[in-house]
Amino acid sequence: MIEIDGDNLTLEDVYSVSVLHEPVELSTKARNKVAEIHRKFLDLISSGQTIYGVNTGFGGLLNIKISREEEIELQRNLIRSHSAGVGKYLPTDVVRSIMVIRANTLAKGYSAVSTELIDALLAMINKDVVPAVPEFGSVGASGDLAPLAHIGLAMMGEGQAFLNGELMRSDIALSKVGLKPYEFKEKEGVALINGTSMMAGIMALVTSRAYRTIENAVRSSLLSFEALRGTSKAFSDWIVSARPHLGQIAIAEKMRKYLAGSKNVEKSDKEKVQDAYTLRCIPQVYGAVLDTLEYVSSVLVTEINSATDNPLFNGKEVVSGGNFHGEPIALAADFLSIALTDMGNMIERRIARLVDTNLSGLPPFLVKNSGLNSGYMIPQYTAAALCNRNKVLSYPSSADSIPTSANQEDHVSMGSTSTLKLLEIEENLEYIVAIEFLLGAQALEFSQDPISPVTKAIYTKIREYVKPLDKDRPSYLDIEKIREIMNKNELINAA
């Protein structure tokens, strides 16, 4: 059971709830705090004080006063009117990630919602009633309004939701698992939707996957490195320590460890002076990507344990601020997009080197009787196409603000676009790595000298699923199979 309290949610917790379906609950301490602040907030409302989003309109309508009798209707209308997203629905694990992060931000208490709202969110997560959330509609300030509104709409029983993978009316989905539609109270509509939880939810899953992909990419590079007879001298501890970036040192250490015992490498260390950059500079490039991921993760951990609503209430005063602005997430997502894209660039160049007989000394396109057989010519095209796609996607969305809400919201982060692009970039990178595994294993079919025990274990694991290429056959299923075992950690755990 994962317990949320508004302060201590980890990326591992988010992954456990969203992907592994670990149940989640509100801590007793947070429950008491939320209930106390909510009670004080209701007293403040009763005093007649003007509070944005409680007894006023929203955005460009902030100067319109709302009567006491209309305050609850205002919240429900907000959910309905802001449910304006378009496009395909976000994956259900992403939506679950969004929901648990939103529940955690509300658990801080500053949003002044009732415990019932948080419980309703968590009940849907635990019963696996997942709102259908279109991917497009957020500009990343004020938060992720449209996507989060679709979650609220499903909570009200007026939207759509997935139950056991089946799309249906949300009221039916709720009824099937014994839940009732939620009735939003004062401020609860704006508290739910005015925040960065879509951006953060996507980022939480992407970062988890990116750590795994980097580990896989290190291993796929071993196959290419051995097949191309690289020299490990450039990975020497004293070389990388002379420029002591933490990621560079960590990757070089892995390369030394994993290549230990390779007769291929021992021979190259004696005969070669230096390699091409895509072999020699793996620690420098992968290390920089790892350092970027570490930075992004630190930003994200802060974000998922922050109050991103507006206005906020500390038990004494209500203040309109800007914690909903997604700039921290937007910049981090754009940064990671660039890093992962460039990692793919390096891998694709090694793939190209493997199939080029003039550079590799291996049979053209890694197949016997080439000419009659085209071998692995086209997987390199696929890798190039994916790299091109990632290069286009890596343009920073955060550099392109477009004012909204009659210029009341005159600078926005576009962080949702940044994270949606990042989600695709990371998936494309997984395929590029899978292609290197496929071609690297095939290249080792022509190796004469013994490879390292780690490289051998990875090669052997691949061969459990994909046989060597003796003559032309479709390769798309092999690429998909390798990506599948990558994401099950089978190649990481092979040695």
Curated annotation (Swiss-Prot):
Compartments it resides in: Cytoplasm
Reaction it catalyzes: L-histidine = trans-urocanate + NH4(+)
2,3-didehydroalanine (Ser) modifications at: 142
InterPro entries from the UniProt entry: Aromatic_Lyase, Fumarase/histidase_N, HutH, L-Aspartase-like, Phe/His_NH3-lyase_AS
GO function terms (MF aspect): histidine ammonia-lyase activity
UniProt-listed GO biological process terms: L-histidine catabolic process to glutamate and formamide; L-histidine catabolic process to glutamate and formate
Pathway given in the UniProt record: Amino-acid degradation; L-histidine degradation into L-glutamate; N-formimidoyl-L-glutamate from L-histidine: step 1/3
Cross-link (5-imidazolinone (Ala-Gly)): 141-143
SUPFAM superfamilies per record: L-aspartase-like (SSF48557)
GO cellular component: cytoplasm
Record keywords, A-Z: Cytoplasm, Histidine metabolism, Lyase
Organism superkingdom: Archaea
EC code(s) of this entry: 4.3.1.3
Recorded coiled-coil stretches: none
UniProt PTM comment: Contains an active site 4-methylidene-imidazol-5-one (MIO), which is formed autocatalytically by cyclization and dehydration of residues Ala-Ser-Gly.
Family designation: Belongs to the PAL/histidase family.
Protein's UniProt name: Probable histidine ammonia-lyase
Organism (species): Thermoplasma volcanium (strain ATCC 51530 / DSM 4299 / JCM 9571 / NBRC 15438 / GSS1)
Gene: hutH
